[in-house]
From Swiss-Prot:
Changing residue 81 to K: Does not affect subcellular localization. Abolishes tryptophan import activity. This is Monocarboxylate transporter 10. It is found in: Cell membrane; Basolateral cell membrane. It comes from Homo sapiens. Residues 27-36 have a biased composition (Pro residues). Residues 1-66, 136-144, 193-200, 250-291, 351, 418-419, 473-515 are cytoplasmic. PROSITE patterns: MFS. Keywords: Cell membrane, Membrane, Phosphoprotein, Transmembrane, Transmembrane helix, Transport. Residues 1-48 are annotated as: Disordered. It comes from the Eukaryota. Not N-glycosylated. Pfam families: MFS_1.
Length: 515
């Protein structure tokens, strides 16, 4: 009778202890007298390890809806790309107007000084992106983009009240550019939340926004500058930033953010937890352990030392080389037209190129961008220069439209925000330095010929570096597959041995207690 009474007691003790452990649903309760015994604790520990993937499921981001509200998000992101980079790409028109407004015959370095305004602005947009990626992870795409557009509005409006070139370094080159950066980077990240299968096409459409604006803005700016002057033109451009401010409200979050992961959806504890997070929690430097991404983050900036030179100095070069030509702004329009075509065309092509092999499209684009830059000084007739600009714009669109899809392929959706942010930050250095160096060469040599020749060299070198990425990525994936297979087998054997030894120990203890 003693045996028949002790068995229910032990079963009751086990059932009462069951809710305290994190054992998964459907798992058999471990035999034994109670939770305090070490063999049962060992079994519970093994069960928790086995239940790991199941408990992580609620934090996984939902599947992209591939449409719906995403189409409105796409249009908002398209306006963002258009207003930010349309203004930047049309800076050649503003550059000439700044020379006329602030220049003096006594200053022989005015081209060099003025070039810093546009290049500093473009560089700061990319330089701030690593910081923007952190804000995007902390506060989401919507808040980051809206605040950025507001700051950009303030910077552009302030630029319309300066009386010399130097204050523009602060108002236009830093404040306006930082605001644009905070508005731009979330527009790349949010697309991956709403689209997956169509991501290449959607990125092509979004980045084509800057092409549309690059086509239209040079003519609009020329008309405005001739009619109302430089300062009122900058105030008109503030309207674009106000619309961008409104567009940012469409970035409704879908994927689980860092905020949700850390606080479990509790908004009150978000700031207190994140404010004192260690740096490694904020800046995800672990992505540089992905060798293919590290090579990509070096090759792209290396290729861009001469990339922005034509956008800043081409209009000045045309004024000097083709003085009799009217409508010189057509060269920037040509780049904008074919850049838009290239973004749509190569964005769609990228959807059919598997995995990291999309990088080969960027290699092709850098080859032609470098070659066309070298051909600009060789064009003795205006028609030839237009043809060169058309080809350059086509492959410029290719390079830009597939940047986000490649980042998704290299590091995955969870880390793509900071992956893009770090890359754009590295891009800021060559894009800031290149145009002033070209302006200095123009001041010293009297023409832009050498500047354009040298601007074509970095894209060729950077493209050669990018060729190694698919090989590095595939090699790493094979190593991971082999290692993962071995680890899974060893883990299964280890778990089985632990369960067997724990069970035998418990049965032995139970028999001892019965005796």
């Amino acid at each position: 009778m003693v045996l028949s009474q002790e068995e229910p007691d032990s079963a009751r003790g086990t059932s009462e202890a069951q809710p305290l452990g994190p054992a998964p649903t459907g798992a058999a309760p471990p035999p034994g007298p109670g939770p305090s015994d070490s063999p049962e604790a060992a079994v519970e520990k093994v069960e928790v390890e086995l239940a790991g993937p199941a408990t992580a499921e609620p934090h996984e981001p939902p599947e992209p809806p591939e449409g719906g509200w995403g189409w409105l998000v796409m249009l908002a992101a398209m306006w963002c790309n258009g207003s930010v980079f349309g203004i930047q790409n049309a800076c050649g028109v503003l550059f000439v107007s700044m020379l006329e407004t602030f220049g003096s015959k006594d200053d022989d370095k005015m081209v060099f000084k003025t070039a810093w305004v546009g290049s500093l602005s473009m560089g700061m947009i990319f330089f701030c992106c690593p910081i923007v990626s952190v804000f995007t992870d902390l506060f989401g795409c919507r808040k980051t983009a809206v605040v950025g557009a507001a700051v950009g509005f303030v910077g552009l409006m302030s630029s319309s009240f300066v009386s010399s070139i130097e204050p523009l370094y602060l108002t236009y080159g830093i404040i306006f550019a930082c605001g644009c950066s905070f508005a731009y980077q979330p527009s790349l990240v949010i697309l991956g939340h709403y689209f997956k299968k169509r991501l290449g096409l959607v990125n092509g459409i979004v980045t084509a926004g800057s092409s549309v604006f690059t086509i239209l803005l040079p003519l609009l700016l020329r008309v405005l500058i001739d009619s109302v002057g430089l300062f009122y033109t900058l105030r008109v451009l503030c309207i674009f930033m106000f619309v961008l401010f409104l567009a940012g409200f469409t970035y409704r979050p879908l994927a689980t953010s860092t905020k949700d992961k850390e606080s479990g959806g509790s908004g009150s504890s978000l700031f207190s937890r994140k404010k004192f997070s260690p740096p490694k929690k904020i800046f995800n430097f672990a992505i540089f352990k992905v060798t293919a991404y590290a090579v990509w983050a070096v090759g792209i900036p290396l290729a861009l030392f001469g990339y922005f030179v034509p956008y800043v100095h081409l209009m000045k070069h045309v004024n000097e080389r083709f003085q009799d030509e009217k409508n010189k702004e057509v060269v920037l329009m040509c780049i904008g037209v074919t850049s838009g075509v290239g973004r749509l065309l190569f964005g769609r092509i990228a959807d059919y190129v598997p995995g990291v092999k999309k990088v080969y499209l960027q290699v092709l684009s850098f080859f032609f961008i470098g070659l066309m830059s070298m051909m600009i000084p060789l064009c003795s007739i205006f028609g030839a220069l237009i043809a060169v600009c058309l080809i350059m714009g086509l492959f410029d669109g290719c390079f830009i439209s597939i940047m986000a899809p490649i980042a998704f392929e290299l590091v995955g959706a969870q880390d793509v925000s900071q992956a893009i942010g770090f890359l754009l930050g590295f891009m800021s250095i060559p894009m800031t330095v290149g145009p002033p160096i070209a302006g200095l060469l123009r001041d010293k040599l009297g023409s832009y010929d050498v500047a354009f020749y040298l601007a074509g060299v970095p894209p060729l070198i950077g493209g050669a570096v990018l060729c190694f990425i698919p090989w590095i990525h595939s090699k790493k994936q094979r190593e991971i597959s082999k290692t993962t297979g071995k680890e899974k087998m060893e883990k299964m054997l280890e778990n089985q041995n632990s369960l067997l030894s724990s069970s035998s120990g418990m049965f032995k203890k139970e028999s001892d207690s019965i005796i």
